[in-house]
Amino acid sequence: MAENKKDPISTAGAAMRKAAGTGLFKNIENLYAERVRQLFKKNDDIRDRGLTPPDDVVRETDISYGTDPAQALDIYYPAGASGPLPAIISVHGGGFVYGDKERYQFYCMSLAQRGFAVVNYSYRLAPEHRFPAQLQDTNMVMRMIGGLSMIDMNNLFMVGDSAGAHLACQYCAALTNPGYARTLGIETPPVTIRACAFNCGLYMFDPKKDRMMARCYLDGPLSDYSDKTDLFGNITEDFPPAFIMTSTGDFLQARAEPFAALLTRIGVENELHVYGDEENRPGHVFHCNIRDPLGARCNDDECRFFMRHTV
C-alpha cells in the first residue's frame, strides 16, 4: 500500500455512501472493496513506476503454499549467499481487501539487500474471503517455509504494515498464547519469532472509524468477534520484542502509543519510533517507498533491531 497522508479508508467510505445512495449498488461491501483497491492501486503504481529488480538479489517466485491462486509466495535473498539466512516474513497491508506480493516485491527485495532471506506472500482477500482466511494463510506459510533451504528457522522475524500489522500482531500473539490460538481455531507450528516490526499499524478496530473495514473483513458484526480481534487482551509476556513504527503524517499514528504502552506494561521489550516532524510529515506506510531516504532509514533501523535479536 502506497504512502498516504490522508485516510484512504475514510475516502473510500465517503465514495461508497455516495454511490450506494444512487441505488445502483446492492452489495455495499463489494463497492467499498473496489473503491479501496482503485485508490491504493493508483498510489502504488505511482510509487513503483520505473523500478526493476536489483541485480544483487536472487528471486524464487510463485511458490504455491495452498490450492487457491492467491496462496503463493516469493523468497528473496542476497546474491552469493551460501547458507541459511535470518529470515523476515512480510505481511502486507491493504485494509484486508487489497494487496499482494507483487505490490510488495521492491520493498521486500530492499530488505533482502540488507542481509536477510525475505518471504513475501499473498493471502486471500476480503470480502471474497472472510476472517480467518488471512490468518489461516499466514499459518500455512509458516508451516511450509521450513522446507526452504535459504531460511534459518532459528532466526525468524516478522514485519507487517497497516492491516498487515494487525495480522502479524495477531499471529505472534497466537504463537505465544496457546489459548488464543485455540480461540482463533488455528494450530500453529513449533516456530519462534525472535522479533517483529509493526509499521503504521492497525492494532485494535475502532467501532466507528473502522466499521466498514471490519464489515468487509469479518463475517458478522465486530461485537461478535471481540474475543478473536482483541489483540490487547491476548498478548502475553511471551510476545516477541517489537519495533513499533509510525510517522507524523500517518493517519493511524494515534494507535501506536497505546500499543507500545501495553507491551511495556506487561513486560514485553519494545521500541516506539515516530518518524518525521511538523515540517516533514511522512505519510502512512512511507517506508514501502524505497526511493524515500527516510523510509530507507526506517528500514535500516528495523533490520538492525532484528539483527540484535538473532541467536
What are these regions (language model features)?
Residues 2-311:
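Alpha/beta-hydrolase superfamily serine-hydrolase fold, recognizing
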